[in-house]
Each structure stands twice: as C-alpha cells, then as structure tokens.
Amino acid sequence: MTTPERICLPGLPTTTDPAPVITQMVRRASSLGFETWWRRVESVGFCTHPIQLVGAGSVGSRQVVWTRCNNRRAAVCPSCSDLYARDTWQLVHAGAAGGHHNMPAEVAARPQVFATLTAPSYGTVHNATGARCHPTSTSPGSRCIHRKPLRCNATHSMGDPIVGQPLCGQCYDYFGHVLFTWHLPELWRRFTIALRRAVAAQLRARGMDRGLVRVSFVKVVELQARAVPHIHALIRLDPPSALTTQSDQNHYGPAATCGGGEPLSDTGSSGWVSPITAGELAALIQSAARQVRVDVLALDGDVRELRFGTQIDAQPLSGEAMGEPVGTGLMARLSPRRVAAYLAKYVTKSLQDFGITARRLSTEAIATLDVTEHVRAILTTITQLAECVRPMAGIGRWLHTLGYRGHITTKSRHYSTTMGALRAARATWTRRQNTKHVEHQGTTRPDWRNIPVTEVPADVDADDVLWKFDHAGHASAGERTLVYSAALQRIHTRQVGLVEARRQVRDQHGDPPGGHDG
C-alpha cells in the first residue's frame, strides 16, 4: 500500500494540516463577495499581510483603505519583498550608473568601489566552497582540546544544513560572535569616518583642498551561513557641492539634525574629475577597514577589542554606463547593473532559514525553537550578555535578529534617490492610472459612503480623513494562501516577461554592457 503524497501549500509550514486551509480557500473562492475581495487584494499587489485603515471624512462618510505591509522579508510577504528588492535595484543602479531618478549621468564616470567587510573567525565551521570542507591534515588524529576532530572530508552543498555549524561548539567563541554582531553598526560608523579622513589626508598630501571630494555610499548587511553579519557596500567619490536647495529637500529629504559635514548638491559638477582614482579608493578602503577598532566590555568585565575580519575585499566598478568595454570575469560581474542585482538579492533575506520568525522572541522560547544548536547557543549567549553586562541590557530585545540592531540597507544622503521617493512616484502614477480608468469608463462615480474601498477616491481628500489602524493580515490561512499563490504567479510572470524582453533586445542589438541583472 502506497502512502499518499502530503500536500504542501505555499507560504505555510510543512507541518500545517492542509485540510482546513483548503476548506477555507474553497469557502472564500465560492463566496458571493469574492470578486470584490479579490479586487481589493489585487489593488495592494497581492500583499499577504495587508494593513487595513478606517477613517471618517469631514462629512462623516466612512472610508476603508487597504495598503501594503511593505515588509522586505520574502518569508513574510513575497509581493512586498519583490517590490522592495526592485526598489533597491533602482536605488543602487541610479547611484552607480546615473541617468535616472534625478541622478546625473556623470556619476558613472566617478570612482566607485564595491567593498565587502566580513567578521573575524570565531571558530572553525563547515563550509561550502565546492571542495572538501576541512580535509585530513598531515596529522589525521588531530583533535581540539575537547577531543573533537578538527577535520571534515565531506564536500557540502550550499543547501546543506551543516554549513556554518562549528566543528566544535565548545571551542567556538560565541561571546565574540555576539559582541561583533551587536556593535557592527558602530564599527561601520567608525569605518566611514576613517575613510573620509583617509581621503582628506590623501588630498592634503598632494597639496589639494580636502573639500574637493565627498564620499557617498550605499550598504547592505547580509547574514552569513555561520549567522554572523557582514557588509556589502558600494562606495563612490563625488565632487564638492553648493548650498542646499529646495530641490535637494525634495529629492533627498531634510539634512541630518546633527550635521555630518556632507556637501549637499551636485550643481555645476559636470566637468569634475576626481583627483583620486578607483584603484586608490580601493586601497584607502582596505586601510580604513583594517584600522577601525571598538573597545567593549566582555562578560568577565575585561575590555575586548572588536574589528573587521581579514577577508576584506574592495574591487573597482567597470564603466558600463559610459559605453566602456566590459571584460570577462570579475570586472564583468562588477558592472553597476550586476552590483545592483547582487545587493537587491540580499535585502529580502530573513532569519527564516535559521528557523527564527520576524517577530520578537522571549528568553523562555529559546528552548522550544526548532533551530540548530549553533543558533540556540547564539540566543543563549545574547540572554547572558543582556543579564550580566549593563551596557548591553537592551540586546535581549533583539533575539529575533540574533543580536543585530541596525538597518539592513542604509546610504549616505546624496548617494541616490530614496525609497520614499520611489514609493511616492509609484503612488502618484497609480492615482493617475485610476483616474484615467474612471474617465475611460465614462460612468458616474459610485456612492463611496456606503461601499468599503481599497483606495481613497479622487473626490475624497486623504488629508481630511482621520485614519486609524483597524487590523493587519487576512481573515484566515486559506485567504492568505490564495493571495500568496497569486503573488508568486505574478512574480513568475514578470520574471518570464523580463527574460523574454531581454532576449529580444539581445537578438536585435547584442548583449548590453555588463550583462543583465538576472
């Protein structure tokens, strides 16, 4: 007798009983209000965790609005995650290649370096390099002080759950691991200060004014297989700028209240040539990253020095947007288009792969989590530091991020456009399309006072409505599964369309410089 195949529904844990969820799906799909509900779902791009707001207008009419959750994590909402990744691509590419989103085309000619700053080694872990993990050495009987073998002759794949796990958990420095994760934002801040000072010193050594160059950047934090974060950053040298204009305020937002000494506008910089080359910038990045230190209190009360690891990489970008020939190998991968796709891929990651949800955890929940012993040891170390080291008392609130308290994506003020500007432009476009649709229909507007809607009608001023949060998410797991499936289908359709469009472009004009973004 054969065992029937288990049904796995998209967006749900494999341990979920599918029968009641399927019943909910059928009930919703066969309901009288399905078409109205589906239009609402479609209006927010098949968001799987939509926010519902309710409000009353100046005349007392009730309005209901659905809006996206805008969560960047693919495990929470594939639709909003995909949109976040595409916005990130636009932001990074505009800053690297220019020519769109109010970024001048001249930025493509400026020195740019793609840098990766990693964490130090806190113990030997299993890896997936394509070769044997830790092959037997000349002394095959070598073991650690805990009598565990320091070798592994297996060749692990990227999906192997053992990748990133320490060969000996007792030898692994979990306190150093957690301290680095917690203080990584401060390490990055000090790195940017050190880099700006290094650039200024380079200019002074050549008898030039230190104000001739401004450092701009965008960075993305990625969690390695060993569950420690490292940084990918695209760093660019810009010309000095004029005073802030209203256009600066519109495009970049207000300046930081505490200052920062950054120039504000690229007005009149079309003929600027950087006195520092991309190769020299890469060397300055390497030097600055190696000299940065942060002294912190450890569990035993001693001072511990934190720093970046030895694997610091800094590679100049190629000149895709200027029509320069792009070679093969590394330089081909480091065109603006490639780097933008590379960074956009990482912003949608979450700790779901480590068995941790995006919601806050309690200390009591650590023992019951379905995670590896490595992750459990990290969580336990976080709680110990929160209890015993006074300056780190707040780390206990960041169990769900394994102690990382910074943003995944950050940028300097003038590197590129902002996520808010991209969303505002998209909202404006959507309103115009909806207005065109209503005008094309040539019908009288419905009575919005008695009909819940997914968007504020054009004849209702959103500023005159007092909006209140009503709830988030769908009414049942069945509804969420329907929406989740539709989101995946839309993403797949868009990707197929992009591949076909690029194929047609290649057939007509040949491969674009730098390749495509995948």
Q: Which residue ranges define each predicted feature?
A:
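Short helix/loop capping segments that flank catalytic or ligand/cofactor-binding pockets
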Residues: 85-89, 93, 123-128, 242-245, ...
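Generic, well-ordered alpha-helical scaffold segments in large soluble proteins
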Residues: 83, 190, 194, 198, ...
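Histidine-centered divalent-metal-coordination microenvironment in nucleic-acid enzymes
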Residues: 77, 115, 208-246, 343
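Long, low-complexity, charged/polar intrinsically disordered accessory regions
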Residues: 1-85, 94, 304-518
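Hydrophobic alpha-helical scaffolding
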Residues: 177, 181, 271-275, 307, ...
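Generic recognition of stable, solvent-exposed alpha-helical segments in well-folded globular domains
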Residues: 72, 182-186, 190, 276, ...
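Signature for HUH/AEP ssDNA processing cores
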Residues: 97, 101-223
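Helical (often loop-to-helix) elements that flank the catalytic cores of nucleotide-handling enzymes
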Residues: 234-301
